[in-house]
A protein has these predicted regions:
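Bacterial N-terminal signal peptides that target proteins for export
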Residues: 1-10
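Mature extracytoplasmic domains of secretory-pathway proteins
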Residues: 61-108
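N-terminal compositionally biased, intrinsically disordered segments and leader/signal-like regions
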Residues: 5, 20-21
Length: 144
């Protein structure tokens, strides 16, 4: 009987290790130097896709977190970046195919001057965020 419980414990440990944290099911991050990571925006800033995260909310809706890096961006760029966020929503969020196969209801787009681990603060790295509701194939800006 002891041997059986040991096997169950080992199998359980492997299953737990292979299971992702809820809300972190998205595809692996694209390396910043990969051609697929480069994104064009109206402002002309050079953007690199850091990652796309899928986050299931408590109500069951799916949020996308599209995270980009723009090494040349400064705080002074912010006023001219609204069209960049809209373009990213239309060209990236609306066309993204979630791993979960649940249509995304919200897209939170962030642009930072350097990669920042999701969920951490980095006061020395400028970051800008915009949120959009994804509805009927359109991006609807959400003030937050």
């Amino acid at each position: 009987m002891n041997g059986t419980w040991s096997k169950v414990a080992v199998i359980g440990a492997f299953v737990a290790a292979a299971t992702t944290v809820r809300g972190q099911e998205g595809p692996p991050a694209v390396p910043l130097d990969a051609p697929a990571a480069k994104v064009s925006v109206p402002s002309g800033l050079k953007l690199l896709r850091q990652e796309v995260l899928e986050e299931t909310q408590p109500d069951g809706t799916l949020w996308l977190r599209l995270r980009y890096v723009a090494p040349e961006m400064t705080r002074d760029n912010r006023p001219g970046m609204q069209a960049d966020f809209e373009t990213l929503c239309e060209s990236e969020a609306l066309t993204y195919e979630p791993v979960t196969r649940v249509p995304a209801a919200q897209a939170v787009i962030s642009i930072a001057t350097a990669p920042v681990k999701f969920g951490t603060t980095a006061p020395d790295i400028p970051q800008f965020f915009e949120a959009f509701r994804l509805e009927d194939g359109t991006c609807i800006w959400e003030a937050f």
